[in-house]
């Protein structure tokens, strides 16, 4: 599963398989290379569709970019995505399971895709679209650990449910933060507790970058997702307790005084 690579195929695969004589064509463009892109997705579903997956649907540009150029209108982008979603829906029914309610699928409403979902006062977005009826709608943070949006009471009726794409690491504009953990556990607790309380419970995804140095916040994020009753919104001020617990797990062979020092450093950094 990827937040932007649909139908169980990675963008890097297309990079190496594309070409003038390739069955997949030579352009990551659903308008000019519809047959090649459809074949690329179809082969991904044939190869991996019977395994346990959450299948990403939708389409973005190469390397985590917007799919259409700057001259494209909001309506242009929305109509393209509708066409893409209809094609992917048919492929998944043919090669994975005709009963789509038994196939976990998600679309990440990340960056420009969020705008295509909501639309504006003149252009109806994809919210409520038949093509997304049973699809998990993955909301996103702002790349810096702050939730951008949460489902309203009316939106929570969506059959596919909601997910959250959260960042502990980010490489991109306007500011990257990588390699050294700078994610404050109380903030993770606050934001993800809020997400859960607003019905975001189907799928949590976290961008951890290079795992080394991010083990601490990653462990908390995963433990919170696995046992929300223990570490979630009812567990007020639990992050200090979690820090001590995690330090004991990682540094159990050192003296208790040293463990306390390590925990203090983690809490105060």
Regions found by a protein language model. Name each.
Residues 2-8, 102-109, 139-140, 165-167, ...:
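A generic structural motif
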Residues 21-26, 64-75, 169-181:
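Glycine- and acidic
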Residues 30-159:
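Gly/Pro-rich turn-and-neighbor structural signature
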């Amino acid at each position: 599963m990827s937040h932007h690579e649909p139908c169980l195929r990675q963008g890097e695969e297309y990079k190496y398989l594309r070409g003038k004589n390739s069955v997949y064509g030579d352009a990551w463009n659903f308008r000019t290379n519809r047959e090649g892109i459809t074949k690329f997705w179809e082969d991904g579903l044939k190869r991996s569709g019977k395994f346990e997956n959450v299948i990403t649907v939708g389409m973005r540009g190469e390397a985590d970019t917007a799919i259409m150029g700057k001259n494209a209108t909001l309506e242009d982008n929305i109509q393209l995505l509708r066409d893409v979603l209809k094609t992917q829906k048919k492929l998944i029914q043919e090669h994975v399971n005709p009963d789509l309610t038994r196939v976990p699928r998600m679309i990440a409403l990340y960056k420009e895709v969020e705008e295509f979902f909501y639309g504006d006062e003149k252009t109806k977005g994809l919210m409520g679209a038949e093509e997304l009826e049973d699809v998990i709608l993955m909301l996103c943070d702002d790349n810096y650990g702050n939730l951008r949006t949460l489902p309203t009471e009316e939106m929570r009726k969506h059959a596919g449910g909601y997910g959250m794409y959260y960042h502990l690491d980010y490489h991109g504009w306007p500011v990257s933060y990588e390699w050294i953990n700078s994610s404050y556990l109380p903030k993770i607790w606050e934001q993800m507790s809020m997400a859960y309380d607003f019905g975001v419970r189907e799928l949590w995804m976290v961008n951890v970058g290079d795992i080394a140095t991010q083990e601490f916040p990653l462990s908390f994020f995963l433990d919170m997702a696995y046992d929300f009753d223990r570490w979630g919104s009812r567990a007020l001020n639990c992050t200090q307790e979690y820090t001590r617990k995690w330090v004991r797990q990682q540094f159990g062979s050192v003296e208790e005084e040293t463990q306390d020092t390590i925990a203090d450093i983690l809490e105060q950094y």
